[in-house]
UniProtKB/Swiss-Prot annotation:
It comes from the Eukaryota. Present with 3750 molecules/cell in log phase SD medium. Residues 210-523 form the Asparagine synthetase domain. This is Asparagine synthetase domain-containing protein YML096W. The keyword Transcription regulation does not apply. GO terms for cellular component: cytoplasm.
Amino acid sequence: MCGILLHYCPNNNYLNDELIEFPEGTEFGDTTCTNESSIFNKIIPYIAARGPNYSSLRAVKAYRISWFSSVLSLRQPFTKQSINVDDRYFLQFNGELYNKEISQGDNDSLYIASMLQNLKEGMGVIDVIKSLEGEYAYTIYDVNSSKLYFGRDPIGRRSLSYSVTPDNELYVASVTGSAGSFQDCIGGVIYEYDTRTKLLNSNQRSHLPYEVTSEIDLNFTSLSEVSKNLYAVLRDSVKKRVESIHPRHIENSPIAVLFSGGIDCSVIVALICEVLQENDYKCGKPVIELLNVSFENPRTGLFPSDTPDRKLSINSAKTLQNLYPNVDIKLVEVDVPYDEYLKWKPFVINLMYPKQTEMDLSIAIAFFFASRGRGFLTSLNGERTPYQRHGIVLFSGLGADELYGGYHKFANKPPHELVEELTRQINNIYDRNLNRDDKVIAHNGVEVRYPFLDEYVIKLSTAEIPINFKVNKLILRKVASQYLKLDGISSEPKRAIQFGAKSAKMTKDGNKHGTDLLKENRNCS
């Protein structure tokens, strides 16, 4: 994973050719680039936080472009960014690719660079982008055409925003805070900025929108076969996301999971355990860290230990530990006192920009603290010891509600309305969830992966699963009970993180609603 920041400034006559490298451990709080704008300098610390293993600043005077990149190294060989491809292309890549041509020992950034190097006649940058499979964001500058390409994968699993100023300057960044006037990139749109004409084209897409089938199987005759197929693609999705974890430091090898104890994340944990058990570990059990976040809530009077998600996570963790004794499953109880919530609230509000509703904050701040991973392990005798997450790859169950009708508001919809709603949900998830979540989670120097949002899982789930199997996640509950022995967990009701962790409605303001705009000022520090 990497952080991306690009600035094209046609009127910057002070830019010099340079490449400055910053080693691991560099502090960026007061970093300034003397020949760059205040917006660029303001964004640098956000980008650096996303990639703690390496950062660099590259500037090319002839093109009037500056690139700041950071790297969280998860694939070998260690690859610095940005990448100069034969002085023809300049590449920034943030994400993970799962194209079958990429072996476990290959680096996906170098894979893209190789594709650009070996483009056949009649093929171009857009053809390379359309061939990518995985979760990613990118910028590519083509020297010969003087065009800048940037965008996100079709589902939008990595954040990216851009801004074109009245003076035709272009900024592209993974995260911006409230610096400048940025808008989020639409998932799957290939943005093309021509530095000669100063025109931005956003008409190309890397993938057509998904369409949910309206097929109904009233007798449930296909339930067994569909469940089998869904289990297979989900397992494959988890497998390729587990086997592509190769961190730079061995202590970062554990896999972490954002864990509420519900069916979505429990299915992911069970599948990870199945994949891990395929290998012979000679140095002890493989480790999975279940990150459960809970808040002290003065409005309800609840402490973190009292929240619904904490209680459920303890029970679900025990179930998983009993099912998979050959895996060291640690439940990390992340407690957030109210004063800690208040301390970080302005920062998280700024980090999730341009999202600015009460609901966005309650979700974002839960993921911020969960991914930070500072919590406790509780022994069998009830003794708690402080624990800091080691894993830097986090798995999330996001996407299950959108694919399988998990939200309460879907329960009583007639089939044709449910088809329309689920189609809208999966095609808009880049804006509704993913941009915000990636910004706040990646700030902790980790990467999040979404097995339910794998291209093949979405294709099967939208095109081949009858719509009546998607009421209250019927099909997923079938997979959980039949293939993963999660019978007890599979019957648990849906509970949104902000309510399960009690990060919503912290104060006694009875008129506050989730869609209300935040009143607090953003603090960029």
